[in-house]
A protein has these predicted regions:
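Basic, flexible Lys/Arg- and Gly-enriched helix-loop patches that mediate nucleic-acid binding at interfaces
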Residues: 1-236
Length: 236
């Protein structure tokens, strides 16, 4: 019982043991007798202090990442995206699904479900990632063609076909990649003589950055959104 309740991230196992001793934990309306009590978290109604807990086997979070945070669980060089989450979520062992550069903003998923996270990042599944980008200079249709054909960068990096869609004056665009290489968007843009001045990820697969989610804030994914991720990653 203590392990089940602690997995929600709301309480530590020590706190759960104290709550059980105080008679504040109910399972299907009956007081839990011991931290070692067994229950099926998928079907049992577990309440603490009168509040029914929502059990999630795995946790999935959408974060609108701000600039200045590292996509890591811990890093001595500066604050990480985990610092943007409350303590009860950090207790659940969440980690970022892939990486965004420190100065890149936008959609970042965090989870404690390693298998699905691995599948989403696997080159075998080619999950699209879309970025909004602002550059110094002007992009043209010639750049769109070069992206579509695949770029061979001077540092030896070979990039697969990517979609570049220009916005208005050509200093802004959307880029869709089907692979994930180190600093890829920045390196591709630099190779065309249009260095990136701002970068934001807006989509991963069929999951779009929530337009109502403020920068630096997070929300839980819905059950349907998680199922959609399983489908596009081949995990179903």
């Amino acid at each position: 019982m203590d392990k089940i309740i602690a997995s929600t991230g709301r309480f530590s196992r020590r706190e759960v043991k104290n709550l059980i001793r105080q008679g504040l934990v109910l399972v299907d309306g009956l007081p839990a007798r011991s931290p070692q009590d067994k229950a099926d978290p998928e079907t049992a109604e577990i309440a603490v202090g009168g509040e029914v807990l929502t059990y999630r086997r795995f946790t999935w979070v959408m974060l609108n990442k701000p600039s200045g945070y590292l996509s890591a669980t811990e890093d001595g060089r500066g604050p990480t995206v985990l610092d943007l989450l409350p303590e009860e979520l950090r207790r659940q062992g969440l980690f970022p699904v892939g990486r965004l550069d420190k100065d890149t903003e936008g959609l970042l998923l965090l989870t404690n479900e390693g298998g699905l996270a691995h599948d989403l990042l696997s080159p075998r599944h080619h999950v699209d990632k879309e970025y909004y980008v602002e550059v110094a200079g002007r992009l043209t249709e010639a750049d769109c063609l070069a992206f579509a054909q695949g770029l061979s960068l001077g540092d030896g990096l070979e990039c697969k076909s990517a979609e570049l869609r220009l916005l208005e004056d050509g200093s802004r665009a959307h880029v869709t990649l089907r692979e994930g290489k180190f600093h890829q968007v920045k390196r591709m843009m630099a190779s065309r003589g249009t260095p990136v001045t701002y970068l934001e990820r807006v989509r991963m697969g069929n999951l779009h950055l929530d337009s109502d989610l403020p920068r630096g804030e997070f929300r839980f994914l819905t059950a349907q959104e998680v199922e959609d991720l399983r489908e596009i990653s081949g995990s179903l």
